[in-house]
Swiss-Prot record:
Name of protein: MPN domain-containing protein
Domain RAMA: from-to ranges: 61-156
Gene: Mpnd
Binding site for Zn(2+): 335, 337, 348
Keyword match tRNA-binding: no
Region (Disordered) residue spans: 1-55, 163-217
Length: 487
């Protein structure tokens, strides 16, 4: 699909569609007009600026309320990054200048009005977009601009009913779109429709409510659907989470079968529980090309920090040696989202696509690469058990090569091992020692819930992945004891 044609900010009526805000700039009472100006629009005569009585007498409409007017009356203050637009998963940030113009931070383009900027940005994401309410789409320090316009009108046009002043200047057909955009913003902010319905009534203030002292307000990212992504965009947040798609939903069959050992999930889950930071590891197994069966037999935790490239190289070399000695192949990788949903981010999707191509190599035969994503502490998990998401990335359609890869949900067969192997127990001991005393180590003696500690939570999650033979449970208790002491 061809890139949308570049728009000249504020140059055409299309960029300020519903309010003709560029015309409103000319009507701006704070800018003044010459003898040939449009003073008649303010109810005056001749070339002078309309007096206060005329301006407040009702002739001054919403169209004449510009950013410059709000700045002059100190409802807004100029600043860098104070303006923002959220649209279909994209965030745009702008600077508000002293003269009321908007500078888009990404390109430095200057726009004369909120509608000009909003329409330009939305067309970049959705070329079919024709118009939109700029004052309802653009936010100033987190609050929609139309609220500031309504506040100005209430201040200066006292005869106007409050309900009328609060109405957004939306044209016919735009209300539904604005509702959809608001729903999307709530999704990106992690606000459900149920939470939205239980919000307390507004206080009438234009300033965001302060966070209570000492209370941490973390916004949990909420995944978006793949169809909302569109073409690849470097300005998009790489940590945007994307829902996985089932093969059935696109009328395709999963191209390979997967069987995973319970010991793999046991060790993986244990590793991901240890720290509040993201962890990474590799998966070893075998690929049976005749039966199209991928069997995952071993997990290899990386006992290194994500930023420690020197240690990571040494650890990876050790893992490759063990794989070779055991006659196993590298068949995938795993990592954690400690407090976020177990779905991949855009960064994860690109990484998985790269790993798939690496494992494929120059051979013509197909060899899959599996990704496992574990979320141990996400508040949306239904219980104490970690959520583990297996996924694989399908390349984008040939006609849309610039799109992101499609994260596909992979069905796995679970194979319960007979016992915990010494390799697994040894890895658990080494992991406990590696994270011992680390600042991001989970404090296992603290409360995870009113009834259970974090150590209880770990044990309950591992219980679903234990082998048939429970004879090694005393060793597991020893490992858990080490964790409790170390945290």
């Amino acid at each position: 699909m061809a890139a949308p044609e570049s728009l000249s900010p504020g140059a055409t009526a299309e960029e300020a569609p519903e309010e003709d805000e560029d015309d409103a700039e000319a009507e701006d009472p704070e800018r003044g007009t010459g003898s040939g100006g449009r003073s008649g629009s303010l109810g005056g005569s001749g070339g002078g600026t309309a007096g206060p009585g005329m301006a407040l007498g009702g002739a001054l409409t919403r169209r004449a309320v510009t950013l410059r007017v709000l700045l002059k009356d100190e409802l807004l203050e100029p600043g860098e990054g104070v303006l923002s637009i959220y649209y279909l998963g994209r965030k745009f940030t702008g600077d508000l200048q002293l003269d009321g113009r908007i500078v888009w931070q990404e390109t430095g383009q200057v726009f004369n009005s909120p509608s000009a900027w909003a329409t330009h940005c939305k067309k970049l994401v959705n070329p079919a977009k024709k118009s939109g309410c700029g004052w309802a789409s653009v936010k100033y320090k987190g609050q929609k601009l139309d609220k500031y316009k309504a506040a100005w009108l209430r201040r200066h046009q006292l005869h106007m009913p409050v309900a009328t002043a609060d109405e957004s200047p939306t044209s016919e057909g735009e209300e539904e779109e604005l509702l959809l955009e608001e729903e999307e913003e709530d999704v990106l902010a992690g606000v459900s429709s149920e939470d939205k319905g239980h919000r307390p009534p507004g206080k009438g203030s234009l300033e965001p409510e302060a966070t209570p002292p000492g209370k941490r307000m973390d916004k949990v990212p909420v995944p978006i659907r793949y169809c909302m992504l569109g073409s690849r965009d470097s300005a998009r947040n790489p940590h945007t989470l994307v829902e996985v798609t089932s093969f059935a939903a696109i009328n395709k069959f999963q191209p390979f079968n997967v069987a995973v050992s319970s010991n793999v999930l046991f060790l993986l889950d244990f590793h991901c529980h240890l720290t509040r930071s993201e962890v990474v590891g590799y998966l070893g197994g075998r690929w049976d090309i005749n039966n199209q069966m991928l069997t995952v037999l071993r997990a290899f935790p990386c006992r290194s920090r994500l930023g420690d490239t020197d240690t990571a190289a040494t650890v990876e070399e050790e893992i490759y040696q063990v794989l070779f000695l055991r006659g196993l192949s590298l068949v995938g990788w795993y990592h954690s989202h400690p407090h976020s949903p177990a779905v991949p981010s855009l960064q994860d999707i690109d990484a998985q696509m790269e790993y798939q191509l690496r494992l494929q190599g120059s051979s013509n035969g197909f060899q899959p690469c599996l990704a496992l994503l574990c979320s141990p502490y996400y508040s949306g998990n239904p219980g104490p058990e970690s959520k583990i998401c297996p996924f694989w990335v399908m390349p984008p359609p040939e006609q849309r090569p610039s799109d992101y890869g499609i994260p596909m949900d992979v069905e796995m067969a679970y194979v319960q091992d007979s016992f915990l192997t010494n390799d697994v127990l040894q890895e658990m001991v080494m992991l406990a020692e590696f994270y011992k005393g680390a600042p991001d180590l989970v404090k296992f003696q603290e409360a995870w819930s009113p009834e259970h500690t974090y150590l209880d939570k770990l044990k309950m999650s591992l219980a679903s992945r234990t082998p048939k033979d429970q004879g090694m449970c005393h060793v597991l208790e020893q490992v858990c004891s080490v964790l409790k002491q170390g945290s």
